[in-house]
């Protein structure tokens, strides 16, 4: 298997959610990553959107790097079909390795774990710990309440507009993914067909 052109870390739910569009979008993300020569980095789970995005990447011939804490492996939540499956001791180890292996980050719909991972890489970016692009897939308005809240935080002057500018949002994964890869400075021979 050839070296990947880029590596994108995807955060998403370990459940499928209540809207079939969530699963469809996770599948599109996985297929797009593989079809464009990329590598998926994710939390190593086999359930929910996590399993769907990994399975779609693998089915399309792509590489998948899973990173999962030992405690979750012991609960039999690990996706054993990953190209690489790294079993780490703690959640902190997991998040660090995922961030190190990524050129860009994308948050799909998910729960508190997805939110926490998204906020952490966003915090690291605003502190200058990395300069990797961060995307938020606002599928069917899933993240609208959070974006309203964040804009109120800006109004209350606990966040600056420049911090909001550090995240890219779109409701369409197939529009957001090429922008993230381009912003990461990775090879983008596919951009003319995607944007």
Q: What are these regions, as identified by a protein language model?
A:
Residues 93-128, 135, 186-193:
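Active-site/ligand-binding-proximal alpha/beta "capping" segment
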Residues 108-109, 133-137, 164-167:
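Flexible, glycine/proline-enriched loop segments at strand-loop-helix junctions
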Residues 58, 124-132, 158-160:
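Arginine/glycine-rich "motif VI" loop of SF2 helicases in the C-terminal RecA-like domain
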Residues 1-101, 139-174, 178-179, 183-195:
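A cross-family phosphate/adenosyl-ligand binding-site feature
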Residues 108, 129-132, 140-145:
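Glycine-rich phosphate/nucleotide-binding loop
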């Amino acid at each position: 298997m050839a070296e990947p052109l880029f590596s994108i870390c995807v955060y998403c739910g370990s459940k499928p959610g209540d809207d079939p569009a969530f699963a469809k979008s996770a599948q599109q993300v996985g297929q797009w990553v593989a079809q464009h020569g990329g590598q998926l980095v994710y939390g190593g789970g086999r359930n929910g959107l996590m399993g769907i995005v990994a399975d779609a990447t693998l089915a399309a011939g792509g590489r998948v790097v899973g990173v999962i804490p030992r405690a979750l492996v012991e609960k039999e939540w690990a996706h054993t079909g990953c190209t690489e499956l790294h079993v780490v001791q703690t959640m902190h180890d997991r998040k660090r390795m995922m961030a190190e292996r990524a050129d860009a980050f994308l948050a799909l719909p998910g729960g508190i774990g997805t939110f926490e991972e998204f906020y952490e890489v966003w915090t690291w970016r605003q502190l200058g710990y990395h300069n990797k692009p961060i995307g938020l897939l606002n599928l069917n308005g899933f993240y609208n309440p959070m974006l309203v809240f964040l804009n109120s935080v800006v109004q209350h002057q606990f966040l600056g507009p420049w911090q909001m500018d550090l995240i890219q949002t779109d409701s369409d994964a197939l529009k957001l993914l090429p922008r993230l890869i381009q912003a990461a400075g990775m090879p983008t021979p596919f951009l003319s067909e995607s944007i």
